[in-house]
A protein has these predicted regions:
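Short strand-edge motifs at loop-to-beta-strand transitions and within beta-strands
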Residues: 44-48, 142, 191, 199-203, ...
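Surface-exposed, short loops/turns at beta-strand junctions within beta-sandwich domains
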Residues: 53-56, 207-211, 292-297
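Short, surface-exposed loop/turn motifs with a glycine/proline- and acidic-biased composition
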Residues: 278-281, 285-308, 313-316
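Surface-exposed, proline-anchored Ser/Thr-rich loop/turn motifs
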Residues: 240-265, 273-278, 297-299, 313-316
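Extended terminal and domain-junction accessory segments
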Residues: 70-107, 186-249
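Acidic-aromatic/histidine active-site loop/patch
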Residues: 94-148, 157
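Histidine- and aromatic-enriched segments that form or immediately flank copper-ligand environments
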Residues: 1-80, 163-193, 213-229
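Short coil/turn motif common to extracellular beta-sandwich-like domains
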Residues: 2-4, 148-151, 254-263
Length: 316
């Protein structure tokens, strides 16, 4: 809070881009809306400047061909903190931030990047918290470990097309203090919280000692009003954490999603299971490549000889 901020942006991509500072109090020239400020064209450079006068949870994203560039991952979160570790002047103190950025991905838009996709046509296939989902949220770096008696500020923001519905177990003692970068008139205890696209909240938790559980994060399709998927954010007493001394990272396949073949650098063989758990491939790779042009659309799990695994999608 109170600092002067400069964001230096270089655009090496073949498309024009901007950085829209979503929710921050900036002047029009630095707001990143191309019709009222400027584009950063291919090979171009620009600097965005603003004063961080208000503490809170904010977002940023590209505002060029917004539907496509959002689902391609051009977004993030900005936190403005007070030096004294209080949420706002006269507000409660906390021990640390725990940012939770919700987003989703429509695979079709990444496979057809030159097509037009109006907002109402976007139907996400992948639903994420801080860019990961499913079992990945159980990795140590994505678990929120707490020390009893030390409040944690959950910084919640949605860049998803979905409506988020969060479920806070009562053992978290969750209280909402801020909405869209400003203190709420009266803080309130929260067990369920809806977050619409672009919204931000700051929720303080002070879990009970010894607690080990999850915050449920439901992703609802807004046009169809259907529950698409639920992710779970793990919260646990730090004394219950166990160092994972032998953890190794699985090789990353590319492109992912794919419609013809996927390549891994390193492993010579693997086994692949479909979403129903059926083994669909087991054997050596051809120079790291796996041919999938005749495979059915869906999600697959690749298991490597060292026991690590990763998921990939086939979309035709």
């Amino acid at each position: 809070e109170g600092e002067s901020v400069q964001l230096n942006f270089t655009n090496p991509s073949p498309e024009s881009h901007t950085i829209h500072l979503h929710g921050l109090d900036v002047d029009q020239a630095n707001d990143g809306v191309p019709a009222t400020s400027f584009f950063v064209v291919t090979g171009g450079e620009a600097t965005y400047e603003f004063e961080a006068n208000h503490p809170g949870t904010f977002l940023y994203h590209c505002h060029v061909t917004t539907t496509l560039h959002l689902t391609m991952g051009m977004y993030g979160m900005i936190l403005v903190n007070r030096p004294d570790m209080t949420l706002f002047e006269g507000g409660p103190g906390y021990s640390e931030n725990a940012p939770l950025l919700f987003s989703d991905l429509a695979i079709e838009t990444n496979l057809s990047a030159v097509q037009s996709f109006p907002f109402h046509d976007i139907r996400p296939d992948v639903f994420m918290v801080n860019g990961v989902s499913g079992d990945q949220l159980e990795q140590a770096e994505h678990i929120i470990d707490f020390e009893p008696g030390e409040p944690i500020a959950l910084r919640l923001g949605s860049m998803a097309y979905s409506l988020l519905h969060l479920n806070f177990p009562e053992e978290l003692n969750a209280i909402c203090y801020m909405s869209d970068g400003r203190p709420v008139p009266e803080p309130f205890a929260v067990s369920d919280l809806e977050i619409f696209p672009g919204e931000r909240f700051t929720v303080m938790i002070e879990p009970e000692a010894g607690w080990d559980g999850h915050i449920g994060c439901e992703f609802w399709n807004i046009p169809d009003q259907q529950l698409e998927e639920e992710q779970f954010v793990h919260v646990r007493d730090a004394s219950l954490s166990v160092p994972d001394w032998g953890a190794t990272s699985a090789p990353v396949g590319f492109p992912n999603p794919t419609n013809s073949e996927i390549t891994w650098l390193g492993p010579a063989s693997l086994r692949v299971f479909d979403a129903a758990g059926n083994s669909v491939f087991c054997g050596p790779l051809n120079e790291g490549r796996l041919e999938v042009s005749d495979w059915a659309n869906g999600f697959y799990t690749a298991v490597f000889p060292d026991g690590t695994h990763t998921r990939f999608a086939v979309i035709h």
